[in-house]
Curated annotation (Swiss-Prot):
Protein source organism: Rhizobium meliloti (strain 1021) (Ensifer meliloti)
Name of the protein: Large ribosomal subunit protein bL31
GO CC terms of this entry: ribonucleoprotein complex; ribosome
Keyword flag Oxidoreductase: no
Function: Binds the 23S rRNA.
GO molecular function, one term: rRNA binding
Subunit structure, as described in the record: Part of the 50S ribosomal subunit.
Pfam families named among the record's database cross-references: Ribosomal_L31
């Protein structure tokens, strides 16, 4: 293996949409950083059978709906 070509692998805290927190190792962020998830397996429609409403953080869903509202889909 070549030296000094791999990203830094460290411990981060992940906060799920229901507030559950856990620690894992990742190359994301810096040591001790917190990753707040907007969608996780407990809230994603693919894993909940479509029963969960999408959370519109940043206005992306409403922007999409406004853009394509005339199509009647």
């Amino acid at each position: 293996m070549k030296a000094d070509i791999h990203p830094d692998y460290h411990t981060i805290k992940v906060v799920m949409t229901d507030g559950t927190e856990y620690e894992t190792r990742s190359t994301w962020g810096t040591e001790g950083a917190t990753m707040n998830l907007e969608i996780d397996p407990k809230s994603h429609p693919a894993w909940t059978g479509g029963n969960q409403q999408l959370v519109d953080r940043g206005g992306r869903v409403s922007k999409f709906k406004k853009r394509f509202e005339g199509l009647g889909l």
